[in-house]
From Swiss-Prot:
One of its GO terms (biological process) is translation. InterPro entries: Ribosomal_eL21, Ribosomal_eL21_CS, Ribosomal_eL21_sf, Translation_prot_SH3-like_sf. Transmembrane segments: none annotated. The lineage of its organism: Eukaryota, Metazoa, Chordata, Tunicata, Ascidiacea. GO terms for molecular function: structural constituent of ribosome. Residues 127-156 are annotated as: Disordered. GO terms for cellular component: ribonucleoprotein complex; ribosome. Pfam families: Ribosomal_L21e. It comes from Pyura stolonifera (Sea squirt). This is Large ribosomal subunit protein eL21. Keywords: Ribonucleoprotein, Ribosomal protein. Belongs to the eukaryotic ribosomal protein eL21 family. SUPFAM superfamilies: Translation proteins SH3-like domain (SSF50104).
Amino acid sequence: MTNTKGYRRGSDMFSKKFRERGAIPLNKYLTVYKKGDIVDIKGDGSVQKVCPHKVYHGKTGRIFNVTQHAVGIIVNKQVRGRIIAKRINVRIEHIKHSKSRISFIQRVHENERKRKEAREKKIRVNLKRQPQQPRTGHFVRSSAEPELVEPIPYEF
C-alpha cells in the first residue's frame, strides 16, 4: 500500500499531537502579527476556516497584509522548474512567528550595544561577522616513545 492516491493520504499532517487536542489556547489569538513579520505555516486541523492548502504546510513566509482574523502571506512555491512567490490568506490559528529571525534580531541588538560603547569611547569597531578562522599552530610534546601499531596476524 505504498504511494496511495486517496483523498485522505495527506490528512495526517493536520492532526494534533497527543495531549494537544481540544480548544486552542488564548495566546494563539493574542499574538500580534505585523507587516513584514516572518511566520511559519502549520495547518491546525481543529480549525477548518481559511486553512492553508497542504502544499504550504511547513513553509515559511512574510506577512504582507493583516485583517481582523487572518493575514496575507507571501510564500515561495516551486512549480516545475521555477519558484513563484504566491500570496495566500491564512487564519492566525495556522501560523506562528518563525524562530529563524531570532538570531538576526539578537545580532542587531548586540551590534547596537557595541556601536553605542564605541561611540562613547570614540573608537572604531568592526561589526561584520567573520568566518571561523583556522586554529593556531602548536607543538605537541610527549616524554614517551611513539608506539608502533600493527594488525594482529589472522590464524585459522
